[in-house]
């Protein structure tokens, strides 16, 4: 129960900037690779994310939804690392390669991206609107 409360507290803390943001985002700028200077954390629209997937063969697609949510479909090539596992420290994100984070509607992946970007992960992208927006854009899904 204590770990659950800690995970919920972490989620609330990380989602606060979303609720309090000014609405400005970097969604209209094209993605740029990290030059090793400062960590990159950007939110991308589904078409931008698809273009990044096609352009960056070293990109790791990380789906932070729960295993039960995969029945809705997943982006081909994505790997499941559930948010709950990350929040409880039982799993971590891959290092040394750029990451595209995916969840149901973009909130959990944004929180994970903010957290790991603050930990020094170099290049992290968040899928705006999550798998719901990806699906609404008519982009390919796979069933697991």
Where are these predicted regions, by residue range?
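Short, surface-exposed ligand- or partner-binding patches at beta-edge/loop junctions that are enriched
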Residues: 102
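Rhodanese-like catalytic fold shared by cysteine-dependent sulfurtransferases
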Residues: 2-9, 13-58, 67-98, 107-144
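Hydrophobic beta-strand scaffold positions of dinucleotide-using enzymes
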Residues: 61-63
């Amino acid at each position: 129960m204590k770990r659950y409360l800690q995970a919920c507290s972490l989620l609330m803390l990380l989602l606060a900037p979303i609720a309090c943001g000014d609405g400005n985002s970097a969604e209209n700028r094209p993605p740029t690779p990290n030059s090793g200077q400062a960590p990159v954390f950007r939110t991308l629209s589904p078409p931008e994310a698809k273009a990044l997937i096609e352009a960056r063969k070293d990109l790791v697609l990380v789906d932070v939804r729960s295993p039960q949510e995969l029945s809705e479909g997943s982006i081909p090539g994505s790997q499941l690392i559930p948010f709950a596992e990350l929040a409880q420290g039982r799993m971590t994100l891959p290092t040394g390669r750029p990451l595209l984070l995916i969840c149901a509607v973009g909130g959990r992946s944004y929180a994970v991206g903010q957290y790991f970007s603050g930990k020094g992960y170099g290049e992290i992208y968040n899928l705006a609107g999550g798998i719901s927006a990806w699906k609404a854009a008519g982009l390919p899904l796979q069933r697991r």
